[in-house]
Amino acid sequence: MALHNGPRKKTRYKFKKDLRSRGVLPVTRVIQQFELGQKVHIVCEPSIQKGMPHRRFHGKTGSVVGQRGRAWLVEIRDGNKFKTVISRPQHLRAQQF
């Protein structure tokens, strides 16, 4: 078989949704707002491809450092480096204390 290198390769189980959570996404997830410095989890929403971060950042936690259009800038720690991930709010969830 040919080797394919698309952005969603190796995500067969990582991006799979629960049977009860399938269907249309609530509007509140699309229009949610975050504050600067707020902790958020990057959880990719597989039904919406636009504004989805790379699969290596799925499950990471970071802090919001800014906004770029409709997307949010999230700073995460990757080893000893800090990286900035651009993601739409559908793929972010606020951390609950």
Swiss-Prot record:
SUPFAM superfamilies: Translation proteins SH3-like domain. One of its GO terms (biological process) is translation. PROSITE patterns: RIBOSOMAL_L21E. InterPro entries: Ribosomal_eL21 (IPR001147), Ribosomal_eL21_arc (IPR022856), Ribosomal_eL21_CS (IPR018259), Ribosomal_eL21_sf (IPR036948), Translation_prot_SH3-like_sf (IPR008991). One of its GO terms (molecular function) is structural constituent of ribosome. It comes from the Archaea. GO terms for cellular component: ribonucleoprotein complex; ribosome. Pfam families: Ribosomal_L21e. The keyword Ribonucleoprotein applies. Keywords: Ribonucleoprotein, Ribosomal protein. NCBIfam families: PRK04306.1 (NF003303). Belongs to the eukaryotic ribosomal protein eL21 family. PANTHER family: 60S RIBOSOMAL PROTEIN L21. This is Large ribosomal subunit protein eL21. The gene is rpl21e.
